[in-house]
Amino acid sequence: MAGMGPPNSAPLPSSFDENADFYNENTIDKIWRRFREEPLIPFGCGLTAWAIVGASRSMRKGDHKMTNLYFRRRLYAQSFTIAVLVIGNLYWQKDRVKRKDYERMKAETERKEKRDRWLRELEMRDEEDKAWKERLAKKTRGAADEAKGVTDMVAEKTKELKDQTLGK
């Protein structure tokens, strides 16, 4: 009896199973998606980097006039980038709200489906466990009945032998 265990020893479902949102979008995909949504921001960052590199080169050369020009260009490029960020944020705000609502609804339906699968799995496990316990109880009752039957048989045989020896 020590070796008998529940018939289904598979692990129970986990709350981390099938978390598609966690695995859907990697970093590169997210960068490309953001680049497609707002292509002027990387352009502004590139202009800023170009202006900083130009300013550092002109500083090494000692050309103060070009250094000041590149620093002004850097300022304009950064202003352009910030303006594009603000305008892009205003433009994409409605889309982001819709996307969040959609993702929230999708997550809710997936959560409900996962919960339903979890409950079905638990119900199946419970039924299996009840059936296993019932079989085990029948087996132990059968062994007890069998043991009782042997005891009764020994008692009957003893009574017969007493009756035979006493001559009844």
Curated annotation (Swiss-Prot):
PROSITE patterns in the record: HIG1
GO cellular component terms given for this protein: mitochondrial membrane; mitochondrion
Glycosyltransferase among keywords: no
Keyword annotations from UniProtKB, A to Z: Coiled coil, Membrane, Mitochondrion, Transmembrane, Transmembrane helix
TM helices/strands, residue ranges: 40-56, 75-92
Domain of life of the organism encoding this protein: Eukaryota
Domain HIG1 positions: 12-103
Pfam families (UniProt xref): HIG_1_N
Listed name of the protein: Respiratory supercomplex factor 1, mitochondrial
Gene designation: RCF1
